[in-house]
Amino acid sequence: MTKETQSFEEMMQELERIVQKLDNETVSLEESLDLYQRGMKLSAACDTTLKNAEKKVNDLIKEEAEDVKNDESTDE
């Protein structure tokens, strides 16, 4: 699977693997920098995914509240 099509869960798993590798004292400086850079990109992608999900949830809550309000006003 390409990195562009990774699910949120797959990105989080990759981030966990990166952290484990960075904790390993035998990782070279060059590899550490590459891992850090990839981790930062994954972190940003996860943050965007979470913000989009939060917006969708908030939109759904607003829609539901409006539906309930409209239902209550038609009942009167």
From Swiss-Prot:
GO CC annotations on file: cytosol; exodeoxyribonuclease VII complex
A Gene Ontology BP annotation from the UniProt entry: DNA catabolic process
Annotated disulfide bonds: none
GO MF annotations in UniProt: exodeoxyribonuclease VII activity
Transmembrane segment boundaries: none
A matching Pfam family: Exonuc_VII_S
Keywords associated with the record: Cytoplasm, Exonuclease, Hydrolase, Nuclease
Protein's job: Bidirectionally degrades single-stranded DNA into large acid-insoluble oligonucleotides, which are then degraded further into small acid-soluble oligonucleotides.
Name recorded for this polypeptide: Exodeoxyribonuclease 7 small subunit
Biological source species: Staphylococcus aureus (strain MRSA252)
Highest classification ranks of the organism: Bacteria, Bacillati, Bacillota, Bacilli, Bacillales
Gene it is expressed from: xseB
